A protein has these predicted regions:
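Glycine-rich loops and low-complexity Gly/Arg-rich segments
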Residues: 13-17, 50-54, 104, 115-117, ...
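Residue-level detector of functional hotspots within protein domains
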Residues: 10-14, 64-66, 85, 120-122, ...
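Short, Φ-rich (hydrophobic/aromatic) sequence segments
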Residues: 1-4, 153, 167-171
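Generic signal for short, ordered secondary-structure residues
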Residues: 21, 43-46, 105, 121-122, ...
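Acyl-donor binding region in acyl/amide transferases
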Residues: 96-162, 169
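A generic secondary-structure signal for well-formed alpha-helical elements
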Residues: 4, 8, 23, 46-54, ...
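A conserved beta-strand-loop-helix scaffold within acyl/acetyltransferase catalytic domains
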Residues: 1-111, 158, 190-202
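Acidic/histidine-enriched, glycine/proline-rich intrinsically disordered or flexible terminal extensions
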Residues: 168, 172-202
Length: 202
């Protein structure tokens, strides 16, 4: 927090107080603390979010079960409950000194709860565990306004058709430059003092 501009520190404290005033119980869970009820609730949140935003749920219910079976000790969930009902949650992975934020969903609208569950609670967990990096995922201007550094996100693809591959390579050459300019623009107005002064992308 000390690295942020005073106005952003004040904004974050205000956001966190607002969420606290809802009276929700927010739990940070990993390992054996993750139960079937959490996975079931997260599945419904995920479906609700994809129905509203993307239209296609590319993860299946069994994917969540398999992740729990194979990676339980690397899963980190932040779940919010109102009385006896789960109302929102995040599904994240961690390894070593990094947390990778992945899925958010909610059954009800609580302004600011997304930031609490997806960012602030993950940062709290990272600090408490001596972790260095919270990777909040691709996209979302609101991340940069809360102290995350804008940086490139990479993926790998192979296209068999030579003409298609050449056309996409040309497009990506132009997009790469545009994205670098966008990243520098975000970091140039970052609320983190040293990022803003250096326009850092790492």
């Amino acid at each position: 927090m000390a690295d942020l501009r005073a106005s952003k520190r004040k904004q974050i404290r205000k956001e966190r107080r607002k969420v606290a005033d809802y009276g929700l119980e927010i739990e940070t869970l990993t390992g054996a603390d993750i139960k079937d009820e959490h996975i079931e609730a997260m599945w419904h949140f995920y479906r609700n979010t994809t129905a509203r935003k993307w239209g296609e749920a590319y993860l299946k219910r069994r994917t969540f079960d398999e992740l729990v079976d194979r990676c339980r000790d690397r899963l980190l969930m932040v779940m919010a409950r109102d009385a006896d009902r789960w109302v929102a949650g995040t599904f994240n992975l961690f390894k070593g000194e990094k947390i990778f934020g992945r899925y958010w969903g909610a059954a009800a609208d609580y302004p600011g709860l997304h930031f609490e569950c997806c960012y602030y609670r993950l940062i709290d967990y990272a600090i408490a565990g001596g972790m260095r990096i919270v990777e909040a995922g691709a996209q979302g201007e609101h991340k940069f306004l809360r102290g995350f550094v804008a940086k490139p996100t990479y993926s790998a693809h192979w296209l068999a058709h030579p003409s298609g591959r050449a056309a996409i390579e040309r497009y990506l050459d132009g997009e790469r430059e545009q994205m670098q300019n966008t990243i520098e623009g975000y970091n140039g107005v970052s609320p983190v003092k040293d990022v803003r002064s250096q326009g850092r992308t790492d």
